[in-house]
């Protein structure tokens, strides 16, 4: 099985940096070489909507409780919501992460972009109390 693209001349990361500016993201290395970027909650829907053209599949969406994690990424806060996107035809994937505080564990819903997000968002709400608005 061929591994997904990481960074190429026309990478999704380069595309995002060109569209939103590199300062809008915090890159995170990953063990599986999947490009992983942290983005603010305020920019999330714009970024996900832009990525939808290139990544038609929301492979996974999940919440993480980071409060007791000892070796967490610098960008993490109390909770993290992770969006794992896939482009089967282009054999590439990307992860987008959003850090949330315990005082305000809310993020806009991605269900209008990928309808299957609704199911994943319900699970994150049930497990961690993360609210998905919209």
Model-derived features: positions:
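Terminal low-complexity/charged segments
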Residues: 1-134
């Amino acid at each position: 099985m061929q591994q997904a693209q990481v960074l190429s001349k026309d990478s999704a990361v380069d595309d995002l940096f060109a569209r939103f500016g590199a300062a809008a993201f915090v890159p995170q290395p990953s063990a599986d070489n999947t490009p992983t970027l942290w983005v603010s909650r305020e920019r999330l829907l714009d970024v996900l909507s832009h990525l939808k053209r290139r990544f038609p599949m929301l492979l996974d969406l999940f919440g993480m409780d980071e409060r007791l994690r000892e070796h967490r990424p610098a960008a993490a806060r109390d909770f993290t919501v992770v969006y794992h996107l896939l482009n089967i035809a282009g054999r590439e994937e990307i992860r987008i992460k959003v850090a949330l505080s315990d005082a305000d564990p809310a993020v806009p819903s991605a269900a209008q972009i990928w309808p299957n997000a609704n199911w994943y968002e319900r699970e994150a709400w049930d497990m961690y109390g993360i609210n998905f608005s919209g």
